[in-house]
Design a protein with these regions (language model features):
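Solvent-exposed loop/turn segments at secondary-structure junctions
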Residues: 73-76, 104-108, 162-166, 248-252, ...
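Bacterial N-terminal signal peptides that target proteins for export
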Residues: 2-14
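Membrane-embedded segments
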Residues: 74-100, 106-118
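C-terminal regions of proteins
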Residues: 31, 229-235, 250-315
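C-terminal motif of bacterial Sec signal peptides marking the signal peptidase cleavage site
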Residues: 22-24
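N- or domain-start disorder-to-order transition segments that initiate the globular core
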Residues: 26-65
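A substrate-binding/cap region within the structured catalytic cores of diverse enzymes
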Residues: 110-237
Length: 315
């Protein structure tokens, strides 16, 4: 389902039409749970100024950043369409970012590089070579992004920590990770107490309240390992700018990937975006800020989209 590559302005217009009319059939999945007439849908909120901005204003800001983090709800096709439009617009503005994917693990990078050195692969060929297409991620949602990066010969970087590494960390704790690597990633230094409490709560909720003993703490350590690894990969792309395709939790400034980017590259210009599913009962952007008391603002921008209806995994 690779879509043709179009210039940034045309792609933005096509995106606006697409998200209003066809997203339900684009994936074969459920349609939007919130109607397209929600007053926030497809609007962008600058959380720094407290003002709505146009897509062009947002894209101009993104083009001026060294690292752009696009935080998604993984299963929402509106979010992937928005990410694609942002990447296309950056290319149209003369930027050539490395595209870093949370969905690919760092030990897959040699396979990506070898395949691209041998020929110009299709997105499906790259997915097959890396195992992306049968990894549990919804490959059709990510195919257009990978195809766009390949079409423009942008670097494609596997950003995440290897699954064997994170599984061992959750099972056996930090002793499973080589001490020097743990220190190099800055993981020997604790999070701010408010961030630690928030992350533990997120992990407990994500496991439907079942996280006995120190299990939630080990899940937090695995989350931090993923965040630090993605930051390391992004900085390793220098001098190229980067775009990170990731879940919104990893894109947070208060405890996600930006925390490590700012520590290791304090002069780098970051832009963090949360793609937000609207709530029918919340029409004020302030209702979506998700700020934790005592911690930095989590996102620079909020881009509102319809929500998708899906079953509660805890029921």
């Amino acid at each position: 389902m690779t879509r043709p590559i179009r210039p940034g302005a045309a792609r933005l217009a096509a995106f606006c039409a697409l998200v209003v009319t066809t997203v339900g059939c684009a994936t074969g999945g459920p349609g939007p749970a919130t109607p397209p007439e929600h007053p926030l849908n497809h609007r962008i909120w600058d959380a720094r100024s407290g003002q709505f901005v146009s897509q062009e204003q947002f894209l101009d800001a993104a083009a001026g950043a060294d690292h752009v983090l696009l935080g998604e709800v993984h299963v929402n096709p509106y979010h992937h369409a928005a990410q694609e439009s942002v990447l296309a617009a950056l290319v149209a503005r003369g930027r050539r970012p490395a595209v870093v994917f949370e969905m690919m693990e760092r030990d897959q990078q040699p396979g990506i590089d070898a395949l691209r050195a041998a020929r110009r692969p299709t997105a499906d060929e790259l997915a097959e070579a890396t195992g992306f297409s049968d990894s549990g991620w919804d490959w059709p949602l990510y195919r257009p992004l990978v195809a766009l990066a390949l079409e423009h010969e942008l670097p494609i970087l596997a950003g995440n920590a290897p699954i064997d590494e994170t599984r061992a960390l959750v099972k056996d704790g930090v002793d499973s990770i080589e001490p020097e690597r743990w220190r190099t990633l800055g993981l020997d230094r604790p999070l701010a107490p408010a961030a630690q409490v928030a992350l533990v709560d997120i992990m407990v909720q994500s496991h439907c309240g079942h996280a006995p003993g120190d299990y939630a703490e080990r899940l937090v350590e695995a989350q931090r390992l993923r965040d630090a690894t993605m930051a390391e990969v992004m900085l390793g792309a220098a001098p190229a700018p980067t775009v990170l395709i990731t879940g919104s939790g990893h894109a947070r400034r208060d405890f996600g990937v930006p925390l490590y980017l700012e520590e290791w590259a304090p002069d780098a210009r970051l832009l963090t975006l949360r793609l937000v599913e609207v709530d029918p009962g919340a029409i004020d952007p302030a209702d979506y800020r998700d700020t934790i008391v005592g911690l930095p603002r989590p996102f620079d921008y909020l881009w509102f989209t319809p929500a998708l209806e899906r079953p509660d995994p805890c029921e």
